[in-house]
Amino acid sequence: MRLYNTLTRKKEVFVPIEQGKVRMYACGPTVYNYFHIGNGRTFIVFDALRKYLVYRGYDVTFVQNFTDIDDKIIKKAQEEAVSAKEISERFIVEYFKDAATLGVDQADIHPKVTENVPEIIAFIQELLEKNVAYEVNGDVYYDVSRFEDYGKLSKQNLEELQSGARIEVNEAKRNSLDFVLWKTAKPGEPSWESPWGSGRPGWHIECSAMAKKYLGETIDIHGGGGDLVFPHHENEIAQSEACTGKTFANYWIHVGYLNIDNKKMSKSLDNFFTPREIAEEYDLESLRFFMLSAHYRTPVNFSRELLESAKSGLERLYNAKNHLEHILENTKVEEMKETEKEWIDSLTHYSEEFNRVMDDDFNTADGIAVIFDLVRDMNTYITGEASKEAVKAAYGMLVELTGVLGLLRKEEESLDKEIGRLIEARQQARIEKNFTKSDEIRDYLKEKGIVLEDTSQGVKWRKE
């Protein structure tokens, strides 16, 4: 597998630090509002990358943080006359709801800044001891002139950055590019005690400290949206490598912008849509399909026309799946023909081709193209005369490859809800001593391959 490394600006063979294991960190949201679908693209990409790595046999530990204390959170809390904690906790819950609608699974660890302040303080102390940071009136700054490799991720040298800097004048700083590690407390704002007085962490230090705590001094993959290359990820490298003396991350992955009218979608430009707004008109699996239909590094212009096209493409895949399910349910052909055995053997070509294109810098667009090639082949070959084994093989390959991308999961979710609804109806019928209806529901589910088990903990179900 090769991945494009932002640090080297080239594709590199992926070799994890520990064979068979991957440690991956992606910068998560600042939780002061609902995230927009530009953020959603990044969440979808890292979710799909994680799924693919697991599919390829890696044991993945994925960490995605929540920035739950920040100027924007404090401002929102003041506007609503509530605590910053109330705002952040509310939007963490909403994040999980919206992420789930996009098919994004929870990370293995979702650390919060406010729960890791002691580790952040200890990290800052190490930087002070190494003389790469300095304290001024309760604020602590990182001295970028003390880190020789500053600018290596964004491919800019210090002189260029300083001459082009549009940074507000701060006489307390030694250099215009120096950035804050610890902010002294302001009246009415959340704060923590530290060796430099009461205050709170700066943005960049949070991820360095949490990545080190949960994944170690060097991690395999780090990334996020393309807008984080500079200054956020550049500053993370400076902090972490100055602190440990080791490479911070071996592979840096950045997701291209989602644009509206060729301008980056952002809250500051007020040109964004949230998943909730898109969900008023579209199934959000179509949005996931849309995001994965382009290479993750390519900037994508969002439009309803393109989303309609994605919706149609996804419907083709669902139609193929439903067609196979229908044949499987109705076919009486048990014995395989010799030609079917050969065709089943040929299906491995699709998984091999899927792996080949996906291994080339996680090319989900080409991966989806392979899936459509499979569907065309299936539609030609699988008819009502096909044997059960041939249909099962085709179905298994389709579900396997789409599952890697987190697609075609709707039936599973709908099935869970439908079974739950029928179990409740059966329970109500039993309470009302309507045993005829109760038995009818049980028999109906049995016909669908669902077996109910009455246990002391309630009714449980399983597929036959």
From Swiss-Prot:
<dbReference type="InterPro" id="IPR015273">
    <property type="entry name" value="Cys-tRNA-synt_Ia_DALR"/>
</dbReference>
<dbReference type="GO" id="GO:0005829">
    <property type="term" value="C:cytosol"/>
</dbReference>
<feature type="binding site">
    <location>
        <position position="232"/>
    </location>
    <ligand>
        <name>Zn(2+)</name>
    </ligand>
</feature>
<dbReference type="InterPro" id="IPR056411">
    <property type="entry name" value="CysS_C"/>
</dbReference>
<keyword id="KW-0547">Nucleotide-binding</keyword>
<dbReference type="GO" id="GO:0006423">
    <property type="term" value="P:cysteinyl-tRNA aminoacylation"/>
</dbReference>
<keyword id="KW-0436">Ligase</keyword>
<feature type="binding site">
    <location>
        <position position="27"/>
    </location>
    <ligand>
        <name>Zn(2+)</name>
    </ligand>
</feature>
<feature type="short sequence motif" description="'KMSKS' region">
    <location>
        <begin position="264"/>
        <end position="268"/>
    </location>
</feature>
<dbReference type="GO" id="GO:0005524">
    <property type="term" value="F:ATP binding"/>
</dbReference>
<dbReference type="Pfam" id="PF23493">
    <property type="entry name" value="CysS_C"/>
</dbReference>
<comment type="subunit">
    <text>Monomer.</text>
</comment>
<feature type="binding site">
    <location>
        <position position="236"/>
    </location>
    <ligand>
        <name>Zn(2+)</name>
    </ligand>
</feature>
<dbReference type="GO" id="GO:0008270">
    <property type="term" value="F:zinc ion binding"/>
</dbReference>
<keyword id="KW-0479">Metal-binding</keyword>
<dbReference type="InterPro" id="IPR032678">
    <property type="entry name" value="tRNA-synt_1_cat_dom"/>
</dbReference>
<dbReference type="Pfam" id="PF01406">
    <property type="entry name" value="tRNA-synt_1e"/>
</dbReference>
<feature type="binding site">
    <location>
        <position position="207"/>
    </location>
    <ligand>
        <name>Zn(2+)</name>
    </ligand>
</feature>
<comment type="similarity">
    <text>Belongs to the class-I aminoacyl-tRNA synthetase family.</text>
</comment>
<keyword id="KW-0030">Aminoacyl-tRNA synthetase</keyword>
<dbReference type="InterPro" id="IPR024909">
    <property type="entry name" value="Cys-tRNA/MSH_ligase"/>
</dbReference>
<feature type="short sequence motif" description="'HIGH' region">
    <location>
        <begin position="29"/>
        <end position="39"/>
    </location>
</feature>
<dbReference type="InterPro" id="IPR015803">
    <property type="entry name" value="Cys-tRNA-ligase"/>
</dbReference>
<dbReference type="Pfam" id="PF09190">
    <property type="entry name" value="DALR_2"/>
</dbReference>
<dbReference type="InterPro" id="IPR009080">
    <property type="entry name" value="tRNAsynth_Ia_anticodon-bd"/>
</dbReference>
<keyword id="KW-0963">Cytoplasm</keyword>
<dbReference type="InterPro" id="IPR014729">
    <property type="entry name" value="Rossmann-like_a/b/a_fold"/>
</dbReference>
<dbReference type="GO" id="GO:0004817">
    <property type="term" value="F:cysteine-tRNA ligase activity"/>
</dbReference>
<feature type="binding site">
    <location>
        <position position="267"/>
    </location>
    <ligand>
        <name>ATP</name>
    </ligand>
</feature>
<keyword id="KW-0862">Zinc</keyword>
<keyword id="KW-0067">ATP-binding</keyword>
<keyword id="KW-0648">Protein biosynthesis</keyword>
<protein>
    <recommendedName>
        <fullName>Cysteine--tRNA ligase</fullName>
        <ecNumber>6.1.1.16</ecNumber>
    </recommendedName>
</protein>
